[in-house]
C-alpha cells in the first residue's frame, strides 16, 4: 500500500483511539460508578472514589497527549507513543481477569483494544 493512501488510515485511527481515551477519561470523572462497571470490574459503592478519579484523569491525559502528538509531531513519534500505551489495555486485560471480571470483557474489550493500538503503531511506523 502506498504511503499516501496509508496516511489517512493510520492518522485517522490514531485520532479515533485518542478521542476514545479522552471519552473514557471524562466518563470516569463524570460518572465513575458506571464507567467502572463498563471497564469490567464494578466499583464498590462504599469504596474510595479517589481511585476512579485518578483513572479518569490519567485516561483523559493520555488521550489529550495522543492528540497533541498527532497534531504537532511526526508519524514515528505517534507510533512510539501507541506502541508504549498499548501496555495499558494489555494490563487492563490482566486486571479484569484477576478481579472477577469476565473473559469476554477482558479479551473482547481490553485485549482487542491492545491489538488495535499495536496495529495502529505498525501503520504509523510504515509511513
Predicted segments — roles?
Residues 30-49:
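Cytosolic, membrane-interface loops and tails of multi-pass inner-membrane proteins
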Residues 72-73, 91-107, 125-127:
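Membrane-helix boundary connector in multi-pass membrane proteins
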Residues 10-30:
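N-terminal signal-anchor transmembrane alpha helix
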Residues 47-70, 84-87, 91:
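Core segments of alpha-helical transmembrane spans in multipass integral membrane proteins
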Residues 11, 104-112:
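Non-cytosolic membrane-interface motifs at loop->transmembrane helix junctions
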Residues 109-124:
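Small-residue-rich segments of transmembrane alpha-helices in multi-pass membrane proteins
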Residues 1-13, 68-78, 121-127:
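Helix-coil boundary and interhelical linker segments in multi-pass alpha-helical membrane proteins
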Residues 17-19, 75-86:
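Structural signature of hydrophobic alpha-helical transmembrane segments
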